[in-house]
Amino acid sequence: MHLFNKIIILSVSVSGLIAQSLPTETSTLFSGSGSCAVCHTQAGPNTAALQDSHGKDVSQTTYWRSTMMANAAIDPLWRAKVQAEIASNPHLQSVIEDKCTSCHAPMGNTQAGYDGQSDYTIAEMLENPLAMDGVSCAVCHQIQDQDLGEGESFSGHFTIDDSRLIYGPFSNPVVGPMVSMVNYTPTMSPHISSSEICATCHTLFTPYVNDAGEVAGEAPEQVPYLEWLNSDYPELGIECQTCHMPAIEENIILSNRPQWLGSRNPLHTHEFVGGNVFMLKMLRNFGDELGVRASEAHFDSTIDRSMRLLERQSVRLNLSAVWNSMADSLTIEVGVENLSGHKFPTAYPSRRAWLELKVEDQSGNIVFHSGAWDATGEIVGLDPGYEPHHQTITQQDQVQIYQNIPRDVNSDKTYTLLRIAGYLKDNRIPPAGYLSDGLAADSTRIEGLATQDPDFNRNGLEEGTGGDKVHYSVSGLSPDASYYISATMNYQTIAPRFAQDLFDYDLPEVEVFQSYYEQMDLSPIPIASVEQTISTSGIKAHTPESQLMVQVYPNPFNPETNIQVSLPEDGNIKLSIFDLQGKQMIEIQRINQSRGMQEYSWDGKDSQGLNLEAGIYVVQIEFRATGSPIASRANSKIVYLK
């Protein structure tokens, strides 16, 4: 048995949802996040610590406490799904609970293992303040550089011992204060900044059972690290932390005590942004009932940061359309480019994204609509089993959905995790550089009709484009009209069929989750869009005939890159470059620019002429046609090397 000791109570109050005290209990291995927050929150005695050059609070606990990491053990979807899995396989309850808590309640699970306990239970988790602290500070910062990146460390098999070493990215840390306050010794180790440390939980293989309920093997439940490994990103030095813990390239004091402490650069923010906006909103909306330890303002900030990631760093769309006068039809091509370092979407198989293509005539009447959705968030015209991958779409009830559909040992569709033996379909868009025979390809395979699509992750014989092209044929149109075409990428954390399968279980945890789910806005999140108007007469319509496009080359670059912007017509342009925190580095405005290609160069400096740090930046183009109040935008990711 291990002892819990109280150190200090830390809470934050704001209007609305109140941020409850972070736990300060301790054990042989761990200390709660409240103990870390004593020093790593923007507060006295040194109130100048943990703020950026604009005076913004960038403290670790302020960012972390409203993330899915902090709330991993509170997450109502996870708790409902665990109970449903146990109900389906009650003889494997101990296996399920121990496996799931290894990453959702790691302090409780790891401490129990250290104490000689073979299996950790949900009941124990609920009574353990450290377990309920989720993926807390003392977990990630104590993971040792042992077997990282190897199968031995995947699926929650990270190594933590009782040496009480806290690993960080900076050399020569000040040791005394941390030793005296929490009995941890800070030490520098580069592995804390590597993707491999994230892979310990975000590479998850789960056992699957056959019809007799016997464990018959294991299959990948989520493997974003392996997807990243089989991409261009490792060679570019772009780690998980680059996007999900973006760096502030400023001199920042990392602790509010001792008062004489110097600054460090950079600070990787503990925002842990991802694609789970839906569950963040649920945690915020029902925080009092769930017992979250963050305020409404905390959650709103994390939601905003997550939306910024989805909108700027997930996918880019382009669109072209041709009028076929012989058939009175439109031929439309929508290109999708994956901007992330893993598949899009990635991780848990409840997620999906789809293209919504809408064609309207000049009176605003919809003449074609693929990918429409209803009030429940379900896609209109979805096939009964599952929607296959499409290369060409000719009917409104055909829709391009990027998803992975699990199968059991009989090749039947399943949503039960312990029945997942593989996938019937996996056309999630791979990252740039992904090869069918590349590293870990057996665990990240493209499945289904996408393997036969010459435009999916391919350009002719070239593999690894990290994109897709979908062709639409819209017939039965009038030759005397103009048509407005819009394409939108919609994203959804929980597909309605996945949710409905869960709701079939009569369990208290499922009822709780369902009650929250049914009060949520179930609309998908639009994360990218592109539009075009085409005139069948050949006369330019009110909106552009071609699209706003941006290309960057070389990319990655050093010392200079060219930014080419294709303007659909005459107008005004604003070019802005942001870091991954959303901070504007430079802005260029040009008025009365002519239609066609415009070119700008960037040398990696900010508006003050100062050299920026190496890393990922986002170029955003905003364009307004002459005389039009409507702005169109295009984004592109730039990698600056040194």
Q: Across the structure, where does each feature detected by a protein language model lie?
A:
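Sec-dependent signal peptide recognition
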Residues: 2-10
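N-terminal module-boundary/linker segments of secreted carbohydrate-active enzymes
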Residues: 20-52
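Primarily the internal scaffold of c-type cytochrome electron-transfer domains
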Residues: 45-85, 117-464, 470-477, 485-535
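Short strand-edge motifs at loop-to-beta-strand transitions and within beta-strands
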Residues: 468-472, 596-600
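Short, surface-exposed loop/turn segments at beta-strand-coil junctions that are enriched for proline
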Residues: 475-480, 607-609
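A glycine-anchored, Pro-Gly-centered beta-turn/N-cap motif
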Residues: 481, 594-598, 613-616
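Glycine-centered coil/turn sites that cap beta-strands in beta-rich domains
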Residues: 540-553, 557-579, 587-591, 599-601, ...
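C-terminal tail/sorting-segment detector
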Residues: 601, 610-642
